[in-house]
Amino acid sequence: MYNGVIKTGQQVMIVRRDGEKIKSKVQQVQLFEGLGRVNVEDARAGDIVALVGLESVDIGDSICDPINPQPLEATEIEPPTLTMMFSVNDSPFCGREGKYVTSRNIRDRLFKELESNVALKIEETTDKDAIKVSGRGLLHLGILIENMRREGYELSISKPHVIMHKDKETGGVLEPIEYLVVDVPEKNMGGVMELVGNRKGELVRMDNRAGQVHLEFTIPARCLIGLRTRMLTATQGTAVMHHNFHEYAPARGEVPGRANGVMVSMSGGAVNAYALNNLQERGVMFVAPTDPVYEGQIVAENSRDSDMVVNPTTAKKLSNMRTTGSDENIILKPPRKMTLEQALEYIEEDELVEVTPQSIRLRKTKLTESERKKAGKKAVVEMVEV
Protein backbone atom coordinates (compact mmCIF):
# COMPACT_ATOMS: atom_id res chain seq x y z
CA MET A 1 0.00 0.00 0.00
CA TYR A 2 1.23 3.47 -0.92
CA ASN A 3 -1.09 5.68 1.11
CA GLY A 4 -4.21 5.59 3.30
CA VAL A 5 -6.17 2.81 5.03
CA ILE A 6 -8.25 0.00 3.53
CA LYS A 7 -10.83 -2.07 5.42
CA THR A 8 -12.79 -5.27 4.85
CA GLY A 9 -16.13 -4.48 3.16
CA GLN A 10 -14.96 -1.07 1.92
CA GLN A 11 -16.06 0.34 -1.43
CA VAL A 12 -13.11 1.16 -3.72
CA MET A 13 -12.50 2.61 -7.18
CA ILE A 14 -10.30 0.73 -9.67
CA VAL A 15 -8.58 3.17 -12.03
CA ARG A 16 -7.18 1.53 -15.15
CA ARG A 17 -4.16 2.61 -17.17
CA ASP A 18 -6.41 4.21 -19.80
CA GLY A 19 -8.29 6.24 -17.14
CA GLU A 20 -11.40 4.02 -17.00
CA LYS A 21 -12.93 3.87 -13.51
CA ILE A 22 -14.73 0.81 -12.08
CA LYS A 23 -16.42 0.59 -8.68
CA SER A 24 -15.84 -2.54 -6.61
CA LYS A 25 -15.94 -3.87 -3.05
CA VAL A 26 -13.23 -5.49 -0.93
CA GLN A 27 -14.55 -8.77 0.50
CA GLN A 28 -11.49 -9.54 2.61
CA VAL A 29 -8.10 -7.96 3.44
CA GLN A 30 -5.19 -10.37 3.89
CA LEU A 31 -1.82 -9.33 5.30
CA PHE A 32 1.35 -11.15 4.27
CA GLU A 33 3.31 -12.55 7.21
CA GLY A 34 6.39 -14.62 6.42
CA LEU A 35 5.42 -17.17 3.79
CA GLY A 36 1.70 -17.06 4.60
CA ARG A 37 -1.28 -14.70 4.77
CA VAL A 38 -3.60 -13.80 7.63
CA ASN A 39 -7.03 -12.17 7.53
CA VAL A 40 -7.14 -8.67 9.05
CA GLU A 41 -9.83 -6.02 9.44
CA ASP A 42 -7.76 -3.21 7.94
CA ALA A 43 -4.34 -2.40 6.49
CA ARG A 44 -2.30 0.80 6.27
CA ALA A 45 0.37 2.43 4.12
CA GLY A 46 3.50 0.28 3.93
CA ASP A 47 1.69 -3.05 4.38
CA ILE A 48 1.91 -5.79 1.75
CA VAL A 49 -1.62 -7.08 1.31
CA ALA A 50 -3.88 -9.22 -0.85
CA LEU A 51 -7.43 -8.04 -1.56
CA VAL A 52 -10.21 -10.59 -2.08
CA GLY A 53 -13.30 -9.83 -4.17
CA LEU A 54 -11.94 -7.45 -6.80
CA GLU A 55 -12.61 -8.49 -10.39
CA SER A 56 -10.91 -7.55 -13.65
CA VAL A 57 -7.85 -6.03 -11.97
CA ASP A 58 -4.75 -5.82 -14.14
CA ILE A 59 -1.13 -4.93 -13.43
CA GLY A 60 -0.75 -1.15 -13.58
CA ASP A 61 -4.25 -0.44 -12.24
CA SER A 62 -4.63 1.63 -9.06
CA ILE A 63 -7.10 0.85 -6.24
CA CYS A 64 -8.26 4.18 -4.85
CA ASP A 65 -10.79 5.86 -2.59
CA PRO A 66 -14.08 6.20 -4.55
CA ILE A 67 -14.68 9.79 -3.37
CA ASN A 68 -11.25 11.21 -4.17
CA PRO A 69 -9.40 8.78 -6.47
CA GLN A 70 -5.70 9.60 -6.86
CA PRO A 71 -4.20 6.89 -9.10
CA LEU A 72 -0.47 6.18 -9.14
CA GLU A 73 1.53 6.52 -12.33
CA ALA A 74 0.88 3.39 -14.38
CA THR A 75 3.72 0.99 -15.09
CA GLU A 76 4.45 1.02 -18.82
CA ILE A 77 4.42 -2.45 -20.37
CA GLU A 78 6.53 -2.95 -23.48
CA PRO A 79 4.39 -3.83 -26.52
CA PRO A 80 4.50 -7.31 -28.10
CA THR A 81 7.04 -7.62 -30.91
CA LEU A 82 6.56 -11.23 -32.06
CA THR A 83 3.51 -13.26 -33.01
CA MET A 84 2.82 -16.89 -33.89
CA MET A 85 -0.15 -19.20 -34.34
CA PHE A 86 -0.97 -21.85 -31.73
CA SER A 87 -3.13 -24.57 -33.28
CA VAL A 88 -4.41 -28.06 -32.56
CA ASN A 89 -1.99 -30.89 -33.27
CA ASP A 90 -3.68 -32.60 -36.23
CA SER A 91 -0.86 -35.02 -37.06
CA PRO A 92 -1.42 -38.82 -37.06
CA PHE A 93 0.35 -38.95 -33.67
CA CYS A 94 -2.20 -36.65 -32.02
CA GLY A 95 -3.09 -37.77 -28.50
CA ARG A 96 -0.32 -40.35 -28.16
CA GLU A 97 1.93 -38.38 -25.82
CA GLY A 98 -0.21 -35.54 -24.45
CA LYS A 99 -3.15 -35.19 -22.10
CA TYR A 100 -4.69 -31.93 -23.38
CA VAL A 101 -5.11 -31.94 -27.15
CA THR A 102 -8.31 -30.07 -28.05
CA SER A 103 -8.64 -26.43 -29.12
CA ARG A 104 -10.73 -25.74 -26.03
CA ASN A 105 -7.94 -27.04 -23.77
CA ILE A 106 -5.37 -24.81 -25.50
CA ARG A 107 -7.65 -21.76 -25.52
CA ASP A 108 -8.54 -22.08 -21.82
CA ARG A 109 -4.86 -22.45 -20.88
CA LEU A 110 -3.84 -19.37 -22.88
CA PHE A 111 -6.57 -17.16 -21.43
CA LYS A 112 -5.61 -18.33 -17.95
CA GLU A 113 -2.03 -17.28 -18.72
CA LEU A 114 -3.29 -13.75 -19.47
CA GLU A 115 -4.16 -13.29 -15.80
CA SER A 116 -0.49 -13.28 -14.78
CA ASN A 117 1.43 -12.70 -18.03
CA VAL A 118 0.76 -9.04 -18.77
CA ALA A 119 3.04 -8.81 -21.83
CA LEU A 120 1.07 -11.55 -23.59
CA LYS A 121 -1.63 -10.77 -26.15
CA ILE A 122 -4.16 -13.28 -27.51
CA GLU A 123 -6.42 -12.83 -30.54
CA GLU A 124 -9.11 -15.11 -31.94
CA THR A 125 -8.87 -16.10 -35.61
CA THR A 126 -11.31 -17.25 -38.27
CA ASP A 127 -9.93 -20.77 -37.81
CA LYS A 128 -11.63 -22.30 -34.77
CA ASP A 129 -8.64 -24.61 -34.19
CA ALA A 130 -6.03 -21.82 -34.12
CA ILE A 131 -5.33 -18.80 -31.95
CA LYS A 132 -2.91 -15.91 -32.51
CA VAL A 133 -0.45 -15.33 -29.65
CA SER A 134 1.83 -12.28 -29.42
CA GLY A 135 4.63 -11.70 -26.95
CA ARG A 136 7.85 -9.91 -26.14
CA GLY A 137 10.10 -12.18 -28.16
CA LEU A 138 10.95 -15.79 -28.78
CA LEU A 139 12.21 -16.37 -25.24
CA HIS A 140 8.95 -15.03 -23.78
CA LEU A 141 6.77 -17.25 -25.98
CA GLY A 142 9.21 -20.16 -25.77
CA ILE A 143 8.86 -20.29 -21.98
CA LEU A 144 5.07 -20.40 -22.36
CA ILE A 145 5.26 -23.25 -24.89
CA GLU A 146 7.73 -25.18 -22.72
CA ASN A 147 5.49 -24.80 -19.66
CA MET A 148 2.47 -26.00 -21.63
CA ARG A 149 4.23 -29.11 -22.95
CA ARG A 150 5.41 -30.00 -19.44
CA GLU A 151 1.81 -29.69 -18.25
CA GLY A 152 0.71 -32.26 -20.85
CA TYR A 153 -0.42 -30.09 -23.80
CA GLU A 154 0.00 -30.99 -27.46
CA LEU A 155 0.00 -28.19 -30.03
CA SER A 156 1.37 -27.04 -33.37
CA ILE A 157 3.31 -23.78 -33.65
CA SER A 158 3.74 -21.72 -36.82
CA LYS A 159 6.78 -19.74 -37.95
CA PRO A 160 7.25 -16.63 -35.75
CA HIS A 161 6.64 -13.21 -37.31
CA VAL A 162 7.52 -9.76 -36.03
CA ILE A 163 4.72 -7.23 -35.60
CA MET A 164 5.20 -4.46 -38.17
CA HIS A 165 3.75 -0.95 -37.87
CA LYS A 166 2.96 1.57 -40.58
CA ASP A 167 4.51 5.03 -40.42
CA LYS A 168 1.59 7.48 -40.46
CA GLU A 169 3.73 10.26 -41.93
CA THR A 170 5.64 8.50 -44.70
CA GLY A 171 3.54 5.36 -45.16
CA GLY A 172 6.64 3.20 -44.80
CA VAL A 173 6.98 -0.01 -42.81
CA LEU A 174 8.36 0.20 -39.27
CA GLU A 175 9.74 -2.82 -37.45
CA PRO A 176 10.63 -3.32 -33.76
CA ILE A 177 14.29 -2.66 -33.00
CA GLU A 178 15.88 -4.16 -29.90
CA TYR A 179 18.86 -2.82 -27.93
CA LEU A 180 21.29 -5.73 -27.60
CA VAL A 181 24.07 -5.81 -24.99
CA VAL A 182 26.78 -8.49 -25.17
CA ASP A 183 29.70 -9.13 -22.80
CA VAL A 184 32.30 -11.50 -24.23
CA PRO A 185 36.04 -12.23 -23.85
CA GLU A 186 38.17 -10.30 -26.33
CA LYS A 187 39.36 -13.47 -28.10
CA ASN A 188 35.75 -14.39 -29.00
CA MET A 189 34.63 -10.91 -30.07
CA GLY A 190 35.03 -11.65 -33.79
CA GLY A 191 32.36 -14.35 -33.77
CA VAL A 192 29.87 -12.03 -32.07
CA MET A 193 30.52 -9.18 -34.52
CA GLU A 194 30.06 -11.51 -37.49
CA LEU A 195 26.84 -13.04 -36.16
CA VAL A 196 25.21 -9.72 -35.30
CA GLY A 197 26.46 -8.03 -38.48
CA ASN A 198 24.95 -10.74 -40.69
CA ARG A 199 21.61 -10.14 -38.95
CA LYS A 200 21.40 -6.40 -39.73
CA GLY A 201 22.79 -5.38 -36.32
CA GLU A 202 24.50 -1.98 -35.96
CA LEU A 203 27.24 -1.37 -33.39
CA VAL A 204 26.47 1.55 -31.07
CA ARG A 205 29.19 1.28 -28.45
CA MET A 206 32.22 -0.88 -27.59
CA ASP A 207 34.34 -0.92 -24.42
CA ASN A 208 37.32 -3.12 -23.57
CA ARG A 209 37.60 -3.82 -19.88
CA ALA A 210 40.70 -5.86 -19.01
CA GLY A 211 40.17 -8.45 -21.74
CA GLN A 212 36.37 -8.45 -21.44
CA VAL A 213 34.61 -6.61 -24.28
CA HIS A 214 31.28 -4.83 -23.73
CA LEU A 215 29.29 -4.45 -26.98
CA GLU A 216 26.03 -2.59 -27.56
CA PHE A 217 23.98 -2.97 -30.76
CA THR A 218 20.63 -2.07 -32.25
CA ILE A 219 19.17 -5.05 -34.09
CA PRO A 220 15.76 -5.96 -35.60
CA ALA A 221 13.67 -8.12 -33.26
CA ARG A 222 13.15 -10.71 -36.01
CA CYS A 223 16.90 -11.23 -36.23
CA LEU A 224 17.14 -12.22 -32.57
CA ILE A 225 15.36 -15.51 -33.26
CA GLY A 226 17.93 -18.24 -32.64
CA LEU A 227 20.77 -15.74 -31.99
CA ARG A 228 21.38 -16.77 -28.38
CA THR A 229 22.08 -20.41 -29.23
CA ARG A 230 24.36 -19.56 -32.14
CA MET A 231 26.24 -16.97 -30.10
CA LEU A 232 26.89 -19.42 -27.28
CA THR A 233 28.17 -21.95 -29.82
CA ALA A 234 30.43 -19.39 -31.54
CA THR A 235 31.93 -18.18 -28.23
CA GLN A 236 32.22 -21.58 -26.47
CA GLY A 237 29.53 -20.51 -24.01
CA THR A 238 31.39 -17.40 -22.80
CA ALA A 239 29.05 -14.72 -24.18
CA VAL A 240 26.42 -13.08 -21.98
CA MET A 241 23.67 -11.25 -23.86
CA HIS A 242 20.64 -9.21 -22.91
CA HIS A 243 18.18 -7.25 -25.01
CA ASN A 244 15.12 -5.06 -24.55
CA PHE A 245 12.78 -3.05 -26.75
CA HIS A 246 14.36 0.11 -28.17
CA GLU A 247 12.08 1.66 -30.80
CA TYR A 248 10.13 1.18 -34.00
CA ALA A 249 12.28 2.17 -36.98
CA PRO A 250 12.25 1.69 -40.78
CA ALA A 251 12.69 -1.94 -41.77
CA ARG A 252 16.31 -2.87 -42.44
CA GLY A 253 15.64 -5.25 -45.32
CA GLU A 254 15.46 -8.97 -45.77
CA VAL A 255 17.67 -11.40 -43.89
CA PRO A 256 18.69 -14.58 -45.76
CA GLY A 257 16.56 -17.48 -44.60
CA ARG A 258 17.24 -21.19 -44.67
CA ALA A 259 19.54 -22.08 -47.55
CA ASN A 260 18.69 -25.79 -47.66
CA GLY A 261 15.54 -27.72 -48.40
CA VAL A 262 14.23 -30.60 -46.32
CA MET A 263 13.47 -34.28 -46.73
CA VAL A 264 9.81 -35.10 -46.11
CA SER A 265 8.59 -38.58 -45.27
CA MET A 266 6.21 -40.09 -47.82
CA SER A 267 4.91 -42.83 -45.50
CA GLY A 268 4.39 -43.69 -41.86
CA GLY A 269 6.05 -46.34 -39.73
CA ALA A 270 9.30 -46.97 -37.91
CA VAL A 271 12.53 -45.53 -39.31
CA ASN A 272 14.79 -48.21 -40.80
CA ALA A 273 18.60 -48.09 -40.54
CA TYR A 274 18.93 -49.39 -44.12
CA ALA A 275 16.95 -46.42 -45.45
CA LEU A 276 18.89 -43.90 -43.33
CA ASN A 277 22.17 -45.30 -44.61
CA ASN A 278 21.16 -44.36 -48.15
CA LEU A 279 19.67 -40.98 -47.18
CA GLN A 280 22.44 -39.64 -44.94
CA GLU A 281 24.68 -39.08 -47.97
CA ARG A 282 22.19 -36.45 -49.18
CA GLY A 283 21.72 -34.46 -45.99
CA VAL A 284 21.62 -34.27 -42.19
CA MET A 285 19.15 -36.60 -40.49
CA PHE A 286 16.72 -35.49 -37.77
CA VAL A 287 15.56 -39.02 -36.84
CA ALA A 288 17.22 -42.23 -35.65
CA PRO A 289 16.44 -45.91 -36.39
CA THR A 290 13.17 -47.20 -34.85
CA ASP A 291 11.83 -43.64 -34.38
CA PRO A 292 8.15 -43.46 -35.41
CA VAL A 293 7.40 -41.10 -38.32
CA TYR A 294 4.32 -40.17 -40.34
CA GLU A 295 3.61 -38.89 -43.83
CA GLY A 296 4.49 -35.20 -44.05
CA GLN A 297 7.01 -35.23 -41.19
CA ILE A 298 10.37 -33.57 -41.88
CA VAL A 299 13.05 -36.21 -41.27
CA ALA A 300 16.21 -34.52 -42.57
CA GLU A 301 17.79 -31.42 -44.05
CA ASN A 302 18.50 -31.74 -47.76
CA SER A 303 21.97 -30.82 -49.02
CA ARG A 304 20.27 -28.97 -51.91
CA ASP A 305 17.96 -25.96 -51.80
CA SER A 306 14.82 -27.92 -52.73
CA ASP A 307 12.54 -30.25 -50.78
CA MET A 308 12.72 -33.99 -51.38
CA VAL A 309 10.09 -36.64 -50.65
CA VAL A 310 11.73 -39.76 -49.21
CA ASN A 311 10.80 -43.05 -47.53
CA PRO A 312 12.81 -43.50 -44.31
CA THR A 313 10.95 -46.74 -43.48
CA THR A 314 12.24 -48.74 -46.47
CA ALA A 315 13.66 -52.11 -45.45
CA LYS A 316 16.24 -54.18 -47.31
CA LYS A 317 14.66 -56.31 -50.04
CA LEU A 318 14.90 -60.04 -49.42
CA SER A 319 14.74 -61.16 -53.05
CA ASN A 320 18.46 -61.82 -53.56
CA MET A 321 19.41 -65.11 -51.90
CA ARG A 322 23.12 -64.27 -51.70
CA THR A 323 22.72 -60.88 -50.00
CA THR A 324 19.68 -61.64 -47.84
CA GLY A 325 21.66 -63.23 -45.06
CA SER A 326 24.86 -61.20 -45.46
CA ASP A 327 25.93 -59.09 -42.51
CA GLU A 328 26.32 -55.56 -43.86
CA ASN A 329 28.02 -53.08 -41.53
CA ILE A 330 25.92 -49.88 -41.43
CA ILE A 331 27.49 -46.83 -39.80
CA LEU A 332 25.03 -43.98 -39.18
CA LYS A 333 25.85 -40.44 -38.17
CA PRO A 334 24.09 -39.16 -35.02
CA PRO A 335 20.87 -37.26 -35.86
CA ARG A 336 20.58 -33.54 -35.20
CA LYS A 337 18.35 -32.91 -32.19
CA MET A 338 16.79 -29.44 -32.05
CA THR A 339 15.66 -27.43 -29.07
CA LEU A 340 12.35 -25.59 -29.23
CA GLU A 341 14.06 -22.30 -30.08
CA GLN A 342 16.16 -23.90 -32.83
CA ALA A 343 13.08 -25.58 -34.32
CA LEU A 344 11.09 -22.32 -34.41
CA GLU A 345 14.00 -20.57 -36.11
CA TYR A 346 14.45 -23.39 -38.63
CA ILE A 347 10.94 -23.77 -40.09
CA GLU A 348 9.58 -21.91 -43.12
CA GLU A 349 6.11 -20.57 -43.93
CA ASP A 350 4.68 -23.93 -45.03
CA GLU A 351 5.97 -25.80 -41.98
CA LEU A 352 5.01 -26.27 -38.33
CA VAL A 353 6.66 -27.35 -35.09
CA GLU A 354 4.75 -30.16 -33.41
CA VAL A 355 5.19 -29.87 -29.64
CA THR A 356 4.26 -32.69 -27.25
CA PRO A 357 5.36 -33.54 -23.68
CA GLN A 358 7.90 -36.03 -25.06
CA SER A 359 8.86 -34.82 -28.54
CA ILE A 360 9.57 -31.83 -30.76
CA ARG A 361 8.95 -32.68 -34.41
CA LEU A 362 9.07 -30.69 -37.63
CA ARG A 363 6.33 -31.20 -40.21
CA LYS A 364 4.75 -29.70 -43.29
CA THR A 365 1.46 -27.85 -42.85
CA LYS A 366 -0.01 -30.01 -45.62
CA LEU A 367 0.92 -33.60 -44.86
CA THR A 368 0.42 -35.25 -48.27
CA GLU A 369 2.39 -34.43 -51.41
CA SER A 370 -0.80 -33.87 -53.43
CA GLU A 371 -2.08 -31.30 -50.91
CA ARG A 372 1.24 -29.44 -51.01
CA LYS A 373 1.16 -29.29 -54.80
CA LYS A 374 -2.41 -27.94 -54.77
CA ALA A 375 -1.46 -25.32 -52.18
CA GLY A 376 1.55 -24.29 -54.29
CA LYS A 377 -0.55 -23.88 -57.44
CA LYS A 378 -3.15 -21.87 -55.51
CA ALA A 379 -0.46 -19.54 -54.17
CA VAL A 380 0.87 -18.95 -57.69
CA VAL A 381 -2.64 -18.13 -59.00
CA GLU A 382 -3.28 -15.69 -56.13
CA MET A 383 0.05 -13.96 -56.74
CA VAL A 384 -0.74 -13.51 -60.45
CA GLU A 385 -4.20 -12.10 -59.68
CA VAL A 386 -2.74 -9.50 -57.28
What role is predicted for each listed range?
Residues 1-84, 94-96, 260, 269-319, ...:
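Conserved nucleotide-binding/hydrolysis modules and their immediate coupling elements
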Residues 19-32, 41-44, 71-89, 117-130, ...:
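Interdomain boundary/hinge elements
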Residues 361, 366-386:
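Acidic, low-complexity intrinsically disordered tails
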Residues 100-114, 184-199, 203:
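Short amphipathic alpha-helix segments
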Residues 14, 91-115, 333:
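A short, contiguous, amphipathic alpha-helix enriched in charged residues
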Residues 103-129, 283:
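Gly/Ser-centered flexible loop/linker motifs
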Residues 5, 55-56, 135-141, 185-189, ...:
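Helix N-cap motif at beta-to-alpha junctions
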Residues 9, 46, 60, 86, ...:
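Residue-level signature of catalytic and energy-coupling elements of molecular machines
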